[in-house]
């Protein structure tokens, strides 16, 4: 499928794809995500239409908490709804994300991931904001580059409607959100062809309506709450396959090979890095360099972070691997092992795994990462 090329940053790429599936956008600006709702507002003002033939209704609220509450209200009323945020703004949305996920509503929260202020303010990219949402019940999809943001944002929207779960669709703040690239851009006709319109209608039919009222948001005692809460397990079990289904639709249209976990590197790799986000592009260069020197290394790129599919991870890792390094772009004080232990428990690996915190070091080329990373691979994982 031929697509036109345009020059844009990650925020605009996300906004372009999000606008196609959005009927209501509830917004509030916060760096570095502000450009996304600015584009949506600009396009709506200009009369641009989504795939449903409508102009997006944009409402700016008083805060991110208000934007999340309006998202909840809009999605309950049957409108395909998006919002855009980062960092402390995302934290203000957490109470409503719990509700939206618990009620099985397909809202999409587009996030340019940014450090959460702790001892000091930091507006640059890490994953501390999205990690804070891991137990909300929202599915979480990550992109590594501007092109991936364009390609995979539709997957979040299509899978949300099909699988009846909200999505946090995220990419690295500044490193991806503000990186300007010449990329291939979706045509809205192709995006309309990708979504299951019957699922969209099914979602709309369940909307709150005074003509056919129904009860929701009841208070339950522990015995009933436990039972009904466990009932959602099958939804999460089925979501990875649903996400892969829409990745396959993207692959069929674009000739790509997007998977829940993509492997890059030597087929007989003995050392592998598992990482998520913009660092993957640098690691790919590092892998090429090291393999050219005779080493056997590879990279597993995490795309669907929640629900986490152990089966897909195991399938992505070559059988020859002896050592695994897991890059974690968040400091979690008090935790033990963090993402390394998740890989271990999810994959059935029973060898010693130690965490390596991926910090904000300014190196951007493979030589720098090689120098810093190989010592970790060889010494911290002996």
What are these regions (language model features)?
Residues 119-123, 242-258, 275-283, 303-309:
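A general structural motif
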Residues 267-295, 308-315:
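Redox- and metal-dependent alpha/beta enzyme cores, enriched for Fe-S-associated oxidoreductases
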Residues 7-13, 248-271:
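Glycine-/acidic-rich phosphate or pyrophosphate-binding loops and their flanking alpha/beta elements
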Residues 323, 327-382:
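Peripheral docking tails and interdomain loops at the edges
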Residues 52-56, 167-262:
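Conformationally flexible catalytic loops at phosphate/diphosphate-handling active centers
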Residues 123-173, 197, 346-357, 367:
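Conserved thiamine diphosphate
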Residues 41-44, 98-101, 157-159, 184-187, ...:
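Short, solvent-exposed amphipathic alpha-helical segments in soluble enzyme
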Residues 1-132, 137, 154, 173-174, ...:
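Thiamine diphosphate
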């Amino acid at each position: 499928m031929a697509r036109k090329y345009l020059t844009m940053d990650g925020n605009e790429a996300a906004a372009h794809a999000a606008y196609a599936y959005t009927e209501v956008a509830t917004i509030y600006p916060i760096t570095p995500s502000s450009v996304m709702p600015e584009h949506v507002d600009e396009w709506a003002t200009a009369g641009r239409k989504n795939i449903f033939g409508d102009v997006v209704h944009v409402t700016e609220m008083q805060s991110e908490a208000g934007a999340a509450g309006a998202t909840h209200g809009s999605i309950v009323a049957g409108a395909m709804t998006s919002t855009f945020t980062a960092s402390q703004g995302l934290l203000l949305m957490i109470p409503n994300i719990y509700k939206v996920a618990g009620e099985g509503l397909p809202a999409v929260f587009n996030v340019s991931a940014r450090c959460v202020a702790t001892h000091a303010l930091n507006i640059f990219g890490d994953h501390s904001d999205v990690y804070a949402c891991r137990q909300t019940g929202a599915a979480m999809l990550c992109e590594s580059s501007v092109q991936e943001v364009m390609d995979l944002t539709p997957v979040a929207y299509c899978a949300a409607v099909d699988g009846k779960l909200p999505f946090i669709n995220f990419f690295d703040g500044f490193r991806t959100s503000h990186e300007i690239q010449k990329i291939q851009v979706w045509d809205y006709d192709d995006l309309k062809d990708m979504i299951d319109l019957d699922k969209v209608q099914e979602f709309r039919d369940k909307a709150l309506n005074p003509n056919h009222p129904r009860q929701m948001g009841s208070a339950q005692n522990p015995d009933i709450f436990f039972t009904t809460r466990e009932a959602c397990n099958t939804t999460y079990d089925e979501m990875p396959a649903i996400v892969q289904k829409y990745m396959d639709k993207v692959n069929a249209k674009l000739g790509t090979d997007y998977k829940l976990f993509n492997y890059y590197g030597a087929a007989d790799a003995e050392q592998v890095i598992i990482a998520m986000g913009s660092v993957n592009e640098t690691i790919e260069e590092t892998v090429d360099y090291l393999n050219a020197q005779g080493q056997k290394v590879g990279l597993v790129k995490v795309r669907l972070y929640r629900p986490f599919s152990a089966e897909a991870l195991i399938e992505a890792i070559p059988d020859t691997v002896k050592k695994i390094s897991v890059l974690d772009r968040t400091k979690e004080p008090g935790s033990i092992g963090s993402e390394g232990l998740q890989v271990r428990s999810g994959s059935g690996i029973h060898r010693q795994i130690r965490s390596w915190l991926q910090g904000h070091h300014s190196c951007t080329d493979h030589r720098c990462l090689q120098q810093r990373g190989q010592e970790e691979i060889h010494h911290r994982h002996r």
